[in-house]
Amino acid sequence: MAAPRASLRLVAPVWNRGTSGIRGLSKAVDPEGSQKKGRTLLQFLTDHFYDVEAVREYLLRKQVLKVQKKNRSFTYIKERYGPYVAGAYFVLKQGGAVKFRDREWMRANEQGLSSLEFRKLQEVPVEAVDASGCAINYQGLDNLLALKELQSLSLRRCPHVDDWCLGRLYQLADSLQELSLAGCPRISERGLACLHHLQNLRRLDISDLPAVSNPGLTQILVEEMLPHCEVLGADWAQGLKVGPEEQSRDAASSPIPAWPSAPPHQARSLPGCAERPTAHPSGSVGLTQLGGSGWGEGRRA
């Protein structure tokens, strides 16, 4: 009998481990345990949802403060070296480029600009600024509006330039000749209406403005507002409704033949079919859809 007892002592740990595994498996498939686990997950999400919102607000606030820091005024540089150097330093620090009179385009390198270069350009006015893609906002325009001899300004794809910023460009009306606003997501037709002060403009780029509701009509009105300016942007017919005469003319000139209609005797043989009149879309365009003031009289037919 000793041999069977010894064998039982050897087999007992293995059997206990197996039964514990079965008990653990029964706990895993227990419906009450799964419900408790679901409640725990929901409680976890509920407890940390406010924390996620707090982190999101913190990151957004941090981004706003970063943009404000980039658009601060360099008062010390302006007082010591003048407005030309201060404006150029502001643009170069954001990754843009500037062009002083009778000089080549200047961009900041990894080491930046030395004070000796600023002293040499202290009395040289800035004629052109390329701030494409820079984080310039309403506050940061203070550094550019002091450049009274500025002739060319590029604000392409600036994410923070909006209609309020365009309302301040009248301060450059005496010198500004070229302006690029292409790709600015916050500029609408209301902001473009503020450009009527810039009568010395010779070239204006308003292409790819997603906030403009009717690009074709907007370009027509801008051309009437600035008659001596070359306006670049969307096609004049983009967003306009085509009248019945234009539709019939386009159908006649189309290389694709129209679908052949049924003969009259076949149409009459169908019982209960009445002839339906063809509805033509209206060709009128409401100028009040732009919603902006300052455009003046629109184009009349």
Swiss-Prot record:
Its main location: mitochondrion. Residues 242-301 are annotated as: Disordered. InterPro entries: LRR_dom_sf (IPR032675). Coiled coil: none annotated. It is found in: Mitochondrion. GO terms for biological process: mitochondrial respiratory chain complex I assembly; SCF-dependent proteasomal ubiquitin-dependent protein catabolic process. Keywords: Mitochondrion, Phosphoprotein. The keyword Phosphoprotein applies. Residues 289-301 have a biased composition (Gly residues). The modification Phosphoserine is found at residue 254. It comes from the Eukaryota. GO terms for cellular component: mitochondrion; SCF ubiquitin ligase complex. Belongs to the ATP synthase subunit s family. Required for the assembly of the mitochondrial NADH:ubiquinone oxidoreductase complex (complex I). Involved in the assembly of the distal region of complex I. Interacts with incompletely assembled mitochondrial NADH:ubiquinone oxidoreductase complex (complex I). This is Distal membrane-arm assembly complex protein 2. It comes from Bos taurus (Bovine).
